[in-house]
């Protein structure tokens, strides 16, 4: 398993949500990055508001840490409605979901994180709720059992997932709006770092924000996490201002290199280079070589490496690119 203190792991850590909540943007006007998503959502939200209707059900997918929960809350704020949040693993029984649905008010947002982890029984309850705003529930047991239908207020379901391919077709097809979040540019992350530094009362130079952004793997959650560690370093070792030099010293100290890689990324890449001659190599072999779960490799380690052009997924397995060799000062494999 990846250690819980891995700073550039984009999955949320305990108590991190309460810290990040204070610095998250509340409205689309403050939302930076994802320009196509932002443009589309502005139109869809304004249209729904002008018609006095609930927004179509929205599916948000993409790697962890890119702001799926933030966007869900922004949608609710823009619509000026309540949002009730839960997650797929929490909804163990159909009754758990029924209790949430029956407490919604007209136009409210129901946010289900990790929606791909809903059980089939719970998912069956969602279908009529999403399509017809009705709840089908069973009363009684055995031969005397009967089904009754309850009308629900119009609501918007927002589902978030890192594994859109794991959704069943009937569920996926019921979302009228589907948005994919992409990794953020250094420019957008620099803005986010500067904004967060302001909320943390930390003096931040533009160059310092860029240095943090470059090592944040295109992910706001990681950028904010690294910012907090740089703040600690600055408080103890510097005069209180984060410039490029201070940011670089702090990030080197916590073992996040200029490409945003930590020991696990380097271990992954070196395993393919040294143990498997640069690939191709199957996921099972990589998982065994580095002592990591396949799902974690696919969901946490590989997306950024692929996006940055360090590895390729091919039908024959994983292959490292010349970039990976250059990162370690090695000569690429000759075919």
UniProtKB/Swiss-Prot annotation:
Residues 4-184 are annotated as: Large ATPase domain (RuvB-L). Mg(2+) binds at residue 69. InterPro entries: AAA+_ATPase (IPR003593), AAA_lid_4 (IPR041445), DNA_helicase_Holl-junc_RuvB (IPR004605), P-loop_NTPase (IPR027417), RuvB-like_N (IPR008824), RuvB_C (IPR008823), WH-like_DNA-bd_sf (IPR036388), WH_DNA-bd_sf (IPR036390). Residues 185-255 are annotated as: Small ATPAse domain (RuvB-S). DNA binds at residues 313, 318. Its EC number is 3.6.4.-. Residues 258-335 are annotated as: Head domain (RuvB-H). Keywords: ATP-binding, Cytoplasm, DNA damage, DNA recombination, DNA repair, DNA-binding, Hydrolase, Nucleotide-binding. One of its GO terms (cellular component) is cytoplasm. It is found in: Cytoplasm. It catalyses: ATP + H2O = ADP + phosphate + H(+). GO terms for molecular function: ATP binding; ATP hydrolysis activity; four-way junction DNA binding; four-way junction helicase activity. GO terms for biological process: DNA recombination; DNA repair. CDD domains: AAA. ATP binds at residues 23-24, 65, 68-70, 131-133, 174, 184, 221. Homohexamer. Forms an RuvA(8)-RuvB(12)-Holliday junction (HJ) complex. HJ DNA is sandwiched between 2 RuvA tetramers; dsDNA enters through RuvA and exits via RuvB. An RuvB hexamer assembles on each DNA strand where it exits the tetramer. Each RuvB hexamer is contacted by two RuvA subunits (via domain III) on 2 adjacent RuvB subunits; this complex drives branch migration. In the full resolvosome a probable DNA-RuvA(4)-RuvB(12)-RuvC(2) complex forms which resolves the HJ. PANTHER family: HOLLIDAY JUNCTION BRANCH MIGRATION COMPLEX SUBUNIT RUVB, PTHR42848. Belongs to the RuvB family. The RuvA-RuvB-RuvC complex processes Holliday junction (HJ) DNA during genetic recombination and DNA repair, while the RuvA-RuvB complex plays an important role in the rescue of blocked DNA replication forks via replication fork reversal (RFR). RuvA specifically binds to HJ cruciform DNA, conferring on it an open structure. The RuvB hexamer acts as an ATP-dependent pump, pulling dsDNA into and through the RuvAB complex. RuvB forms 2 homohexamers on either side of HJ DNA bound by 1 or 2 RuvA tetramers; 4 subunits per hexamer contact DNA at a time. Has 3 domains, the large (RuvB-L) and small ATPase (RuvB-S) domains and the C-terminal head (RuvB-H) domain. The head domain binds DNA, while the ATPase domains jointly bind ATP, ADP or are empty depending on the state of the subunit in the translocation cycle. During a single DNA translocation step the structure of each domain remains the same, but their relative positions change. This is Holliday junction branch migration complex subunit RuvB. The gene is ruvB.
């Amino acid at each position: 398993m990846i250690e819980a203190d891995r700073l550039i792991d984009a999955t949320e850590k305990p108590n991190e949500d309460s810290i990040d909540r204070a610095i998250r943007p509340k409205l689309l006007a403050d939302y930076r990055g994802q320009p196509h998503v932002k443009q589309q959502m502005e139109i869809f939200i304004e249209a729904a508001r002008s018609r006095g209707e609930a927004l179509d059900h929205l599916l948000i997918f993409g790697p962890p840490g890119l702001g799926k929960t933030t966007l869900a809350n922004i949608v609710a704020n823009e619509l000026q409605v309540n949002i009730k949040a839960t997650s797929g693993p929490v909804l163990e029984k159909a009754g758990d979901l029924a209790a949430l649905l029956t407490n919604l008010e007209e136009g409210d947002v129901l946010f289900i994180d990790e929606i791909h982890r809903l059980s089939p029984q719970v998912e069956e309850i969602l279908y009529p709720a999403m399509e017809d705003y009705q709840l089908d529930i069973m009363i009684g047991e055995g031969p005397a059992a009967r089904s009754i239908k309850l009308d629900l207020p119009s609501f918007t379901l927002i589902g978030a997932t890192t594994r859109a391919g794991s959704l069943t077709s009937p569920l996926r097809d019921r979302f009228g709006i589907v948005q994919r979040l992409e990794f953020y540019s250094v420019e957008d992350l620099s803005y986010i770092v500067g904004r967060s530094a302001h909320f943390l009362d930390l003096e931040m130079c533009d160059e310092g924000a860029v240095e943090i952004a470059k090592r944040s793997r295109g992910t706001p959650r990681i950028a904010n996490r690294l910012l907090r560690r740089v703040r600690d370093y600055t408080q103890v070792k510097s005069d209180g201002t984060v410039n490029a030099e201070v940011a670089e010293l702090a990030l080197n100290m916590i073992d996040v290199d200029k490409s945003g890689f930590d020991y696990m990324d380097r271990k992954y890449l070196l395993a393919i280079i040294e143990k498997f001659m640069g690939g191709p190599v199957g996921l099972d072999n990589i998982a065994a070589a580095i002592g990591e779960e396949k799902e974690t490799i696919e969901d946490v380690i590989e997306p950024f490496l692929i996006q940055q052009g360090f590895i390729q997924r091919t039908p024959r397995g994983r292959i490292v690119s010349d970039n990976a060799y250059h990162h370690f000062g090695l000569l690429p494999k000759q075919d």
